[in-house]
Amino acid sequence: MKQGEGHTIYMLGIGGIGMSALARYYHSQGYIVAGYDRTPSPLTKQLENEGMAIHYEDNPNVLPALIDIVIYTPAVPRDLKEFEALRRRDLPILKRAAALGKITENHFTIAVAGTHGKTTTTAMVAHILNQCGKSTTAFIGGIANNFDSNLLLSQEKESVLVVEADEFDRSFLQLHPDISIINSIDADHLDIYGDRQHLVQSFNDFANLTEKEVIVKEGLGIVTDRGICFGFGNNNDYKTTIIRSEKGITDFVIQSEDSTTEIRLPMAGQHNVLNATAAFIAARKIGIPVTDIAEALTSFKGVKRRFDIRVNNKKHCYIDDYAHHPEEIRSCLTAVRDSFPEKHITLVFQPHLFSRTRDFMNEFATVLALADELILLDIYPARELPIKGISSEALLNKVNVNHKRICKKEELINLIDNEKPELLITMGAGDIDRFVEPLENMIKTW
């Protein structure tokens, strides 16, 4: 009998990338899983096809009669009618982070943290372990192309658990990591933390939760006696040197006190080389030989919406990316320039959150100017209300690009079809992802 047999878990915001992975995990453990989300999506349809009941109307009358546990995402508004009805039923109610934390209590856990790069790094660690025959369960904050899922599920009880550790709302402090990775700390979520100093402190708190090694990129300000430092500098425990990078393939070397390993990564960008270095160290620390790790990385296929090359033919190229912070945008556009130095870059960017746009207005303006042509969609509000004076128009006025414009979402497909850009990038963390398949299919007909 499976552990969840006969018990029902109800999930508010079940269609989110993190929530849907949890839903799949609980379903695999025998739980009856049902939930609510605001709108249908390809992911919710997949969950329904896997046997989970989902509805899209905030209606307490359709709640299951028997519920054992409620799990919610912070993205769900507290005044949701269903949420209020569930609280009145005096049920155990857990945040997603707390639920994931309970799972990590019972497994050897590798937790991947960082304001950028954690999804790709988590997928890399999971792929290496899986490829090298290590029993692995992984919760990934995106759809890993090697698994075509955000959940890698081991059928064995004694599996290694790999999880993405989210700093938003200090969620990662609910986890119980044995090995942790911290690969970036840039100012973000200032609505939660106030300033970078408090953000760094939270990452230090996360490091101190770690039982064994803390694998940390150089220069982040993490103070721990269990740290293993990596980066391009000479004084690191693991020093990485890029040999060459062309046509989306990067060759590099990782040197440590006792080994030198050459690696070919089928990805562009210095940031991805550092992600791979962190994954390499984590795999090595649980006993996987360096030659096996290097071999596994050659077959890593990336994550959907992370430098995701959707079309690349003689006439046109289309790349989709989740970047929504200035440093992520810089990394992506730099990698595109390195991979396609002769091409004219048209960027469609959907700013994510009024607060983030306000806090980094000048930084966004600087990095968006790395494109040759800029198309801005309206700000995606997510959980926020508008902020006076903060708009895509205000941002556009600050960007020093000759060809720039605002575009309504309903006009985007026609605009792109008329312009037929040589190299198109769609970018953002909002609902811009709904355009990816239509754009891909259209560009393939040009």
Language-model regions: role of each:
Residues 411-442:
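A glycine-rich beta-strand to alpha-helix segment
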Residues 36-37, 55-58, 94-98, 139-142, ...:
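Beta-strand->loop->alpha-helix junctions that form or flank phosphate-binding loops
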